């Protein structure tokens, strides 16, 4: 019950506000500056998201559509909002390109991934309840939730070219700072309430997140000749542990909580080894093929 109270605060207030201000403070020039980076991020990350969804939907007979949707929100999404700067800046330094990668991956994960995941989740719950609804109803229901429409509104804000009011920044930055703490704390409460049991689904989720996603980004970046430094940052961003927001959504909907939290815990531990490994692999590939 305590976790659910925190989840509601995070999903309805803190996270939407944080997502909005993070994206709205970007600009069209930033998105267009490296169009190749933007397109590869969108296509590959969402392809990985849907691969995770279909793998968990059809390879495990006991899984429902809602289970698969939550698994995609967890193992198909890097936790860029919480760990993006914390991981990338110590490795690559504080510069505009780090901010660019974090902003673009954040837009893909939050403005595309979360609404798609919630739509699949709502459709699965409606199907399980035996309701025959319009295929658009789950999408509309997902978009009614602040955590889905706030990042989409922010993207529209950026594309239209409206400058973010400087006088609003301090208030939103305060909420953004509180969101990171609340979200991690809420995810921690959820983790503490669940007995961690390693199973094949948790292991597969970690493999898909830590191996498949960065590997596909690396291959796409090499094929389309991305700038080496940007490619390294994008690969590390893709290798980040699963999104904490996925765990919060799982707990809020009472769906796939145990396996999802186990996969998150396993991925966080394994990331300590996979991060330097992917840096070495990407560096070697860039020297060989770019």
Placement of each model-derived feature along the sequence:
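Alpha-helical transmembrane segments of multi-pass small-molecule/ion transporters
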Residues: 1-290
């Amino acid at each position: 019950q305590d976790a659910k109270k925190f989840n509601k605060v995070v999903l309805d207030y803190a996270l939407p506000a944080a997502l909005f201000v993070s994206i709205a403070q970007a600009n069209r020039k930033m998105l267009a500056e490296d169009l190749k980076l933007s397109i590869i991020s969108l296509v590959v990350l969402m392809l990985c998201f849907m691969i995770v969804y279909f793998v968990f939907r059809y390879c495990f007979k006991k899984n429902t559509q809602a289970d698969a949707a939550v698994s995609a929100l967890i193992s198909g999404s890097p936790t860029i909002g919480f760990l993006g700067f914390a991981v990338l800046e110590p490795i690559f330094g504080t510069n505009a390109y780090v901010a660019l990668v974090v902003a673009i991956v954040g837009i893909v994960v939050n403005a595309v991934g979360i609404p798609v995941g919630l739509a699949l989740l709502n459709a699965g719950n409606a199907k399980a309840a035996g309701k025959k609804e319009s295929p658009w109803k789950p999408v509309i229901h997902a978009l009614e939730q602040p955590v889905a429409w706030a990042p989409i509104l922010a993207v529209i804000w950026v594309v239209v070219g409206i400058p973010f009011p400087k006088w609003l920044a301090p208030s939103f930055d305060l909420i953004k700072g509180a969101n990171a703490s609340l979200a991690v704390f809420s995810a921690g409460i959820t983790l503490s309430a669940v007995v961690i049991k390693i199973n094949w689904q948790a292991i597969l989720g970690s493999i898909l997140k830590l191996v498949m996603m960065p590997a596909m980004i690396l291959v796409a970046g090499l094929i389309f000749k991305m700038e080496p430094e940007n490619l390294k940052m994008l690969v590390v961003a893709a290798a980040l542990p699963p999104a904490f927001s996925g765990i919060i959504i799982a707990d809020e909907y009472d769906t796939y909580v145990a396996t999802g939290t186990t996969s998150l815990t396993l991925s966080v531990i394994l990331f300590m080894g996979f991060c330097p490994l992917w840096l070495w692999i990407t560096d070697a590939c860039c020297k060989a093929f770019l």
